[in-house]
Amino acid sequence: MMKSSFLIVPILALTLPFLGAEEQNQEKLTRCESDKRLFNEEKVKYIPIYYMLNRFPSYGFFYQHRSAVSPNRQFIPYPYYARPVVAGPHAQKPQWQDQPNVYPPTVARRPRPHASFIAIPPKKNQDKTAIPAINSIATVEPTIVPATEPIVNAEPIVNAVVTPEASSEFLITSAPETTTVQVTSPVV
């Protein structure tokens, strides 16, 4: 009892200030709940990572086909390169097109077969010796279980024999010195 009280007192002393602060935070949220939530949602919408994550739908296994964003233009919400702008009336514009460095996925997607359809060849163990086949028709000798208790009252000696064919049953065989007794049943 004394050990448990020594354990409970420090735990309560450490957790009570946090519980009090939690209640104060709940009261502040209820006062200006709508203003803070609107502000937080608007702030999250303008984060560039948020733009990039929501810009591309998930293509499953074909994510590598998406175009890459230029490393020096990390805040652009679209993944294409900007064409260079040359100032001056007689400047010659380059005649090449901006293309992404990775091609977009094709319209027809190849189906991915399930792993159960893949044929795996069996391993060849040439260095191991061949295991001889076991003859299941071979005769099995019965195991003799000795009697554990001595028999009193001059009854015949009984040995229990266990065979694999009758694994849960014990066959009882009598010794040759047994006597036969006739049993009559009363007629009802």
From Swiss-Prot:
Keyword flag Cytoplasm: no
Expressed in which tissues: Mammary gland specific. Secreted in milk.
Marked site: Cleavage: F117, I118
Keyword Glycoprotein: yes
Glycosylation sites: T143, T148, S167, T184
Primary location: secreted
Annotated signal sequence range: 1-21
Gene Ontology annotations of biological process type: lactation; protein stabilization
Keyword terms, alphabetized: Glycoprotein, Milk protein, Phosphoprotein, Secreted, Signal
Pfam families, alphabetized: Casein_kappa
Job description of the protein: Kappa-casein stabilizes micelle formation, preventing casein precipitation in milk.
Record-given protein name: Kappa-casein
Protein's gene: CSN3
